[in-house]
Amino acid sequence: APGVRRPVLRTEPRGERLEIGLADPGFADVNGRVDLKDANVLVIDGTGVTMRELMIPISRHQPLVLVARGMDEDVLATLVANRKSLTMPLAAVITDLIPEVADLTGALPVSVADLRAGYLPAGHLGHATRWITDGARTWIEPHPPLVGTT
């Protein structure tokens, strides 16, 4: 009808866009993406992480995004199965853009050896107001800075 204002549809999510896709399409929802609000971000420094090292972070810090340079296929398959069967708010991405993700989320990369030893201080986790990843891109909406910190 004339004079009726229509809402503007946003074609891209808000936040910083990076060329990072999902580590496995099984993490995606029916729309082909993961959309997590108030996500915790675990940046893993190194490769070779196993499910044993990931069980505590996954159980304690949901929703959780795992960010690593590489991850074994069996680990990814188990993560996808947990996401689907237990409806866990969980995603994994494989990327070399570790410093960029750490900077945007405030994460401190954690070594596989530290995870193996059970060492994961809460302050090492990054955070995002919203984390959206599809097959090829990620949008990270950082948490607003705390009042009084500059």
Could you tell me what each predicted segment is?
Residues 1-150:
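Core, soluble structural subunits of large cytosolic macromolecular machines
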